[in-house]
């Protein structure tokens, strides 16, 4: 399968690429940073993993930067995995509109635009494709300072649910993976005390496995998940 993955250069996105490649897929990775970790994976899977550096905050340029210059119509796109995200940690009384708009551009508007053109590619090639969005447990449980970020993930979940309903008749599926707290670059600013408080809210009292999240994504795009669509799949160590 041909798979487009955003936010591919580190953390969950990189692990998703790794699992996809291990199973023989071809991966088109999009991110802002071309990291050493991604380059190493690219060298290991030469000819199966491709990269393009793109500013995902520029929602209006997505058609040109992704679907004309990278994944053209000659590529039969089977899967789009939306993993890229921007954090915004602050309390509501400090809400800044410019920061909010910048986050929504990356977390909501650009994924919507990529979904639009991914669907057009699938329709052009009569592909029974699959769309998977990576959400956050913060959209389902309250955390101080995450109201704005959580709202963007909630919007994404609603978008996925309705996309699934809209295009299911043509065999196109859309699902969301909802990870719990993971040890990634996005969470690296938290203190050990803050992390421990989060762990205590889970049934397994630990951070969510990045590998487990990646393998759930790959399961959802497989034939084994052919009857799963419009769902939010929690991989959160029993937080919810």
Give a label for each model feature:
Residues 136:
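Residue(s) in the substrate-gating loop at a strand-loop-helix junction
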Residues 120, 124, 165-169, 226:
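Alpha-helical segment proximal to the catalytic Tyr-Lys
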Residues 206-235:
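C-terminal substrate-recognition "lid" of short-chain dehydrogenase/reductases
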Residues 9-10:
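Conserved glycine-rich cofactor-binding loop
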Residues 87-101, 120, 145-148, 186-191:
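Conserved mid-core segment of classical short-chain dehydrogenase/reductases
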Residues 115, 152, 160:
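Active-site helix of classical SDR
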Residues 141, 162-172:
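Active-site-adjacent segment of SDR/Rossmann-fold oxidoreductases
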Residues 86, 93-113, 132, 156:
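Catalytic Tyr-X3-Lys loop
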């Amino acid at each position: 399968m041909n798979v487009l993955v955003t936010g591919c250069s580190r953390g969950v996105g990189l692990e998703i690429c790794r699992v996809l490649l291990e199973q023989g897929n071809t991966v088109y990775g999009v991110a802002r940073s071309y990291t050493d970790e991604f380059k190493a994976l690219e060298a290991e899977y030469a000819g199966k993993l491709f990269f393009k550096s793109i500013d995902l905050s520029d929602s209006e340029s997505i058609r040109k930067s992704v679907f004309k210059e990278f994944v053209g119509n000659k590529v039969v796109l089977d899967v789009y995995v939306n993993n890229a995200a921007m954090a915004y940690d602050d309390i509501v009384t400090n809400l800044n509109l410019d920061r909010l708009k910048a986050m929504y551009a990356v977390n909501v508007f650009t994924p919507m635009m990529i979904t639009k053109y991914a669907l057009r590619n699938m329709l052009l090639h009569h592909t029974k494709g699959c769309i998977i969005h990576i959400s956050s447990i913060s959209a389902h449980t309250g955390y101080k300072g995450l109201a704005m970020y959580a709202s963007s993930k909630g919007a994404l979940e609603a978008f996925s649910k309705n996309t699934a309903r809209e295009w299911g008749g043509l065999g196109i599926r859309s699902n969301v993976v909802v990870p719990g707290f993971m040890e990634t670059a996005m969470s690296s600013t938290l203190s050990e005390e803050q992390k421990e408080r989060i762990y205590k809210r889970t049934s397994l009292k630990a951070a969510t496995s990045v590998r487990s999240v990646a393998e759930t994504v790959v399961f959802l795009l497989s034939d084994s998940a052919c009857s799963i669509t419009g769902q939010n799949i929690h991989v959160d160590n029993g937080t919810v």
